Amino acid sequence: MINISFPDGSIKQFAKNITAYEVANAISMSLAKAAMVAEINGELQDLSIVIDNDCKLRILTAKDPECLEIIRHDAAHLTAEAVKELFPETQVTIGPAIENGYYYDFARDTPFTTDDLAVIEAKMQELSQKNEQVTRELWDRDKAVEFFKSIGEHYKAEIIASIPAGEPITLYRQGNFIDLCRGPHAPSTGVVKHFKLMKVAGAYWRGDSRNEMLQRIYGTAWATKEQLDSYLLMLEEAEKRDHRKLGRELDLFHFQEEAQGMVFWHDKGWSIYNTIEQYIRKKIRKNGYTEVKTPVLVDKSLWEASGHWEKFRDDMFALETDDKTLALKPMNCPCHVQIFKQGIKSYRDLPLRMSEFGLCHRNEASGALHGLMRVRSLVQDDAHIFCAAEQITDETVSFCKLLTEVYKDFGFTDIKVKFSDRPEIRAGSNEVWDKAENALKEAVEQAGFTYTLNPGEGAFYGPKLEFVLTDAIGRQWQCGTLQMDFVLPERLDASYVAASGEKKRPVMLHRAILGSLERFIGILIEEYAGRFPLWLAPVQVAIATITSDLNDYALEVQKALIDNGVRTDFNISPDKINYKIREFSNQKIPMIAVIGKQEQKNKQVAIRRLGTTDQEVLSVEQLIAVVKEENEKYL
């Protein structure tokens, strides 16, 4: 007999060689019917797994969040099965679960069409309703390679041949379809009920542009119809808010082929950019940061010394000149260390908080570029804190508070923290890592955050915090980071004189709040759906005259607003007032100042705020005061 421990703390005895499914059935038939996979000693397994030793067991159903990835992986296999039934000449390659769904890559001569997706999805529904049994099989490597070659699946044969010797070769069979997979999977295809195929895109085999182009079908799958419908509704709303679409409509920026991944900022977009930079500059000055500016083009010797040349060379833009290799900086940290090293630093100089709106360049693949969200030229609200080990907690607490203030000012209050601890391969002793991790954990708790752990996901040079925002339609964006670094000060020979007189290495905290300004502006455009708050809007007040004989007064009002730092636009054309109001509303300008004869007579304006038909009559001085008060809160 074996002892099986359950999540409620109970321990029950069962005969050896019992399957997880049989245990579930012994507990209740309803549990066995709903069961998808088993968690045995913390590891997810198929329900068919044979249990022959004492263990901790948890039976998972579709209600458990861990099963969402299983459902999506199952949906990927279901997609491949449907494609093979409909288009048998197609070769299958790989199909993992990803955030919000899955994809499967196929090799075929004829591209899939939108009509094909509808047919494939219908076939998937049919296969789901068949509720085909899914079984796991262990195969001999050579036999598996020969089998897939014999049925024309050469990509699968190549994958199997590349699996290290000694690793098991597991295949999963459902109906007439068989696929290479580690698993686990649910026991039948019927668990995949709520799904939709989204689009087809190109993808290179093994992600290498030198290889052949495959066709990638993207899909989404959920545990319930309500979840699927909610997700599709969110996508519909996201499409309306797409920053690329709004960027064109609101005349904020554009991209073009001659400068891929580089933003052409228009005056209104550049206004938003500069306002955010001004806001951040005020915040960091209040929090004891100095601001610096470092070169964009730096000799490769510095990147070699820092380790970036070895690690990021393929992502860097480099050029040869005067027998030297220069590189556009992909990040600011090595340059900040050079400033720290100018002159002798004492423990009294620490913590030293050094910030920069640093222009960086990264050679992103053209296929990865995505509007403002993924660019090749970017400016980071970057800072590095040089401190002693005993100052880590206080500095992290201060940073968390600053970050919270900033996010709140932009309207983000739902902030999640991810904590990435030591990886297997790392620099520094366990004692150093213990102290570093404990310092960050203590700081996060002091700042009032809870965190989720990403085990082993820290950099080799130190643990990391990531700050994730949730936007108005429920999407999550990782923006802020705080990365501890024991290694770069050592590599670049940064030191300070301790109170004892000995030379010590500072700890370096890499931190950013917004990430890149480009990406954060993209997030804000979608968060606000283009309706920027008054202090941030590129045009704060638009002036519209009812008749042309009021134009002189309108120009007086505009001059008064501009003289007081209010960003304005005006329309004194002979167009009808309703047209002018509609046009300014479409441009999502927060305040429209309507001028009629009464307003001219009383030296006033009638203010209509975006999204309302109500009007509020103000003197020009009152209007200026309203805008100034809002600006001064943030700027």
From Swiss-Prot:
All residue ranges annotated as the TGS domain in the record: 1-61
Binding site for Zn(2+): C333, H384, H510
CC cofactor note: Binds 1 zinc ion per subunit.
Gene3D superfamilies hit by this protein: 3.10.20.30, 3.30.54.20, Anticodon-binding domain, Bira Bifunctional Protein, Domain 2, Threonyl-trna Synthetase, Chain A, domain 2
One GO biological process term: threonyl-tRNA aminoacylation
Domain of life from the UniProt record: Bacteria
Segments of this protein annotated with the region Catalytic: 242-533
Cofactor(s) required, per the database record: Zn(2+)
Catalytic activity, EC: 6.1.1.3
UniProt keyword terms in alphabetical order: Aminoacyl-tRNA synthetase, ATP-binding, Cytoplasm, Ligase, Metal-binding, Nucleotide-binding, Protein biosynthesis, RNA-binding, tRNA-binding, Zinc
GO molecular function, one term: threonine-tRNA ligase activity
Subunit note: Homodimer.
PANTHER family to which the protein is assigned, alphabetical: THREONINE--TRNA LIGASE, CHLOROPLASTIC_MITOCHONDRIAL 2 (PTHR11451:SF44), THREONINE-TRNA LIGASE (PTHR11451)
Protein name: Threonine--tRNA ligase
Taxonomic lineage: Bacteria, Pseudomonadati, Pseudomonadota, Alphaproteobacteria, Rickettsiales
